């Protein structure tokens, strides 16, 4: 295998194969679950809206891939600062059967100078998730924060409040994952000494095997080779899968999403 193919194989097993579109249907989610069982191996997870969790669970079980995890989103995509609503949505996602919850950090509140509400919101959602053995990823929306100091601060607050992962983006704003924001966020994980318990997820804009290889190389450099396993690293993507399969010599269609 070439270096790119090795990276593509790694990346495929780290994918949160995603559809978060307003026109999602049961049929589209079923098709996504079928794609998660790829000829080159299973993706780590599918990421879908909460109402589709039951049909995804049924599909994954019936196709013999019960270990593919189901991630969903809460406080999404706007990252409002109403803790109670974020908590109610997170509890509902858990009740639907989510294995993982990706909650949006109240990033606009942080930009306005309020650090406390972000901590309190993540902490409340973490307590709900921990009680159900559900993984919590916190989306800090780096493309809106823009400023390196704010990206670092949002990462630090999320980690201190209990995040299991910090994630770049919703995929719903003009600027999503970038290597620059990834380096900032993984550097925080390294500098806080939490690499054993906290992972990183770039999302939105990671579309090719070459893109994925760059993120994995960055993770290897900052946090050590072997750190970026499925407990510590995910790609939030949809169209990436087709590129990975093509790189690995398989013919496959993408999901057609821009995520």
UniProtKB/Swiss-Prot annotation:
PANTHER family: DEOXYRIBOSE-PHOSPHATE ALDOLASE. Keywords: Cytoplasm, Lyase, Schiff base. GO terms for molecular function: deoxyribose-phosphate aldolase activity. Pathway: Carbohydrate degradation; 2-deoxy-D-ribose 1-phosphate degradation; D-glyceraldehyde 3-phosphate and acetaldehyde from 2-deoxy-alpha-D-ribose 1-phosphate: step 2/2. One of its GO terms (biological process) is carbohydrate catabolic process. It is an enzyme of class 4 (lyase). It is found in: Cytoplasm. The lineage of its organism: Bacteria, Pseudomonadati, Pseudomonadota, Gammaproteobacteria, Enterobacterales. Belongs to the DeoC/FbaB aldolase family. DeoC type 2 subfamily. The active site is at 102 (proton donor/acceptor), 167 (schiff-base intermediate with acetaldehyde), 201 (proton donor/acceptor). This is Deoxyribose-phosphate aldolase. Catalyzes a reversible aldol reaction between acetaldehyde and D-glyceraldehyde 3-phosphate to generate 2-deoxy-D-ribose 5-phosphate. Its EC number is 4.1.2.4. GO terms for cellular component: cytoplasm. It catalyses: 2-deoxy-D-ribose 5-phosphate = D-glyceraldehyde 3-phosphate + acetaldehyde.
């Amino acid at each position: 295998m070439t270096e790119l193919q090795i990276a593509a194989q790694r990346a495929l097993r780290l994918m949160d194969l995603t559809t978060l579109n307003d026109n999602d249907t049961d049929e589209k989610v079923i098709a996504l679950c079928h794609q998660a069982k790829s000829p080159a191996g299973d993706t780590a997870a599918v990421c879908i809206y909460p109402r589709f969790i039951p049909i995804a669970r049924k599909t994954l079980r019936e196709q013999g891939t019960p270990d593919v995890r189901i991630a969903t989103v809460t406080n999404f995509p706007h990252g409002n600062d109403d803790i109670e609503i974020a908590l109610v949505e997170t509890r509902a996602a858990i009740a639907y059967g989510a294995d993982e919850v990706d909650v949006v950090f109240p990033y606009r509140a942080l930009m306005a100078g309020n650090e406390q509400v972000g901590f309190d919101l993540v902490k409340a959602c973490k307590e709900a998730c921990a009680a159900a053995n559900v993984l919590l990823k916190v989306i800090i929306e780096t493309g809106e924060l823009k400023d390196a100091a704010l990206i670092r601060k949002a990462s630090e607050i999320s980690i201190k409040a209990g995040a299991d992962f910090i994630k770049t983006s919703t995929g719903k704003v003009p600027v999503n994952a970038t290597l620059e924001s990834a380096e900032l966020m993984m550097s925080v994980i390294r500098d806080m000494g939490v690499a054993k318990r906290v992972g990183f997820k770039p999302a939105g804009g990671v579309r090719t095997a070459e893109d994925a290889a760059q993120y994995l190389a960055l993770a290897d450099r900052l946090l050590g080779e072997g750190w970026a396993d499925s407990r510590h690293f995910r790609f939030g993507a949809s169209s990436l899968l087709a590129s990975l399969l093509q790189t690995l010599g398989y013919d496959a269609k993408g999901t057609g999403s821009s995520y």
